């Protein structure tokens, strides 16, 4: 199964200032990877499925989706967590970030860097999550500001420079060089999530398209043609696969940073190496209510594997909880699986003591990720 091949798993999220198009981006990625019907994406805003959210038009709960993307003849599993885009949801954002290894920072081409852009970059780097950049709403530069191709390039350059100024201030030392975003290196893409197109320098080289052609499509408002010539999902999912770390690589440097236990302990070693046969270690990012299955704990499995019937301990609680079902996400749908293994974003029912931030393990003595506050 693909979800056991750690080198082919990417756990990523999207983060942005409010209304810069993060949810539209997530939806159209999911849809592009073949999970939604064509006309609904964009209008339907698949990730914001709580009514409360749609009413406010902002993402409150980090929703999840898993997608399969083929790249150079190899299949990759991309687990996407939609991080809350609103500063009021700070605790949730930090937890969602902790479950990720890479993040797409979304910046509106017209508005540029905003206060919240800085906040989400800081949160990502604090959890050792590697950033790439997507400059969104590029069509608005022509529609509203009549920007020339040269001006457009300058604007992109300015946004990239500003993002890097924020990254360099907060990036962990060992990644100072590698984690700067760079159009030449393929860690920057630009486009319109709403109109379903994107491009990047590697993509243009691969498809033999130049920026002038892309600009002409925009100027003539040939949105459909542009989405066919430069599909959003292909450009971004390629960037995710090539430029963001796989689960096994990331856990080596992230676990010692985000976990408070001794990395020499067995469970520490098991997490650092994302071992499917070690004790299970599961960090809950949120608990969702399912009309059929009751409470479902969603989060990142850093070590071990979990199946129905397993006895699990919620840190700080005296009694074991018995697992009722395990699975993964496709959009708002939870797909039941026989077992779930280390390195994935998973959903588990039956953990009645779990709450957002809980650490859950088959090992009763495991040091939790977060301090337990009573």
Question: Language model features by range: what are they?
Answer:
Residues 1-374:
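Structural and coupling elements of P-loop NTPases
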